[in-house]
């Protein structure tokens, strides 16, 4: 039926009636016009596809019918088992209701009271259960008097199977009845039945039910475990996603900071370009000043050498024997020296010799300062204090003053000498540091100058090559022009003139190169 309906729907979809009478329908014969053309490839493909689908549907229909048959059989057996269970349950309740004895007694049952079973069921009941049901019916008056048996008590019939009923007394005062010959049997899943009332099919069903319950519990436990794992994984995934979002936000902030710092760096470079230019200018000025100080240092060194030679050649004692009145006339402009001269007048005769030496040294230093005109405040280099040019008090060991010096005067003179030496050493250290810095700057400037000179020489060599090429081209042009006008003397003179010019230019460049190097 399903196949016919599907085939009818397919036929309607192709525009043909289910009978297939039209000539254009697939599978139908030609209409009243005679035999039509053969089926097209599309129609044949559709027909094959439809045939395969019909075959598949037939197979599914057969399987579905088998499944329905099995389902109906299982339903029938289930109804039968339910009916048997209801009968057994009702009989057990009836026995418990009417068989409550105070002592143990025997009961007779037999097949005489059995009736033929009903046509709808009852064939699966045991003989003892049927006999008990028939006996109960007779005792209650359910059987008619002419049914073939007398209404006697079922416990007094001969030829029956003996069973017993036991009454137990519990501790609480109650009474418990146990029915024989079977005993109570409790299923592991809590379903309580009696052994004598259970058929193998019911026992198998209980076993299957217990197995299904165990599998259900196992599946439930596994499902709960998987659910817990899934929840934990979901929590971890959410946490990782939040961490990834935070990392992305931090990365964006870092990129923004980097861009901002780059912009600030560009601005800072632009602002620092002017101070760098000023520093370069100051460095150049300092270099010029250093050159001037070097020249000044050479002059001062020469003057000091002359003074040392004069000291060695003449008597030092004559140089430093000066009257206090003469000192007042020569050094009246200096305030410090005038104060010292005033004090010298008040000194004793023993201190005159030491003061004369100190005043003479100061006078010589002032004379050198006035002669060469250098300042103490500026960074000019006075002279290089080494073993050859440094004037110390040790150089005046040959001086023999006329007045004997006392111990206190010698101590004062030594302190003055140490102070002067420390002052000159401090200034020398400062000058050496300044000289080192300036020499470093000069070395840098010289390296830059050498680089520029090399570049200039390369450009000069390129210019020389270009000049040679231009002169060659000029000669070629003049030669081609002179071919038309035959004047060999003029051509020779012009060639000699150009050759002389090139030679002079080469000589000038050769003179310039040694000077540059």
From Swiss-Prot:
Residues 104-129, 330-349, 478-517 are annotated as: Disordered. Residues 485-497 have a biased composition (Low complexity). It holds the Pfam family Filament. Residues 501-517 have a biased composition (Acidic residues). Keywords: Coiled coil, Intermediate filament. The keyword Ribonucleoprotein does not apply. The keyword Coiled coil applies. Gene3D superfamilies: 1.20.5.170, Vasodilator-stimulated phosphoprotein. Residues 53-484 form the IF rod domain. GO terms for cellular component: intermediate filament. InterPro entries: IF_rod_dom (IPR039008). Belongs to the intermediate filament family. PANTHER family: 1-PYRROLINE-5-CARBOXYLATE DEHYDROGENASE FAMILY MEMBER, INTERMEDIATE FILAMENT FAMILY ORPHAN 2. This is Intermediate filament family orphan 2. It comes from Homo sapiens (Human).
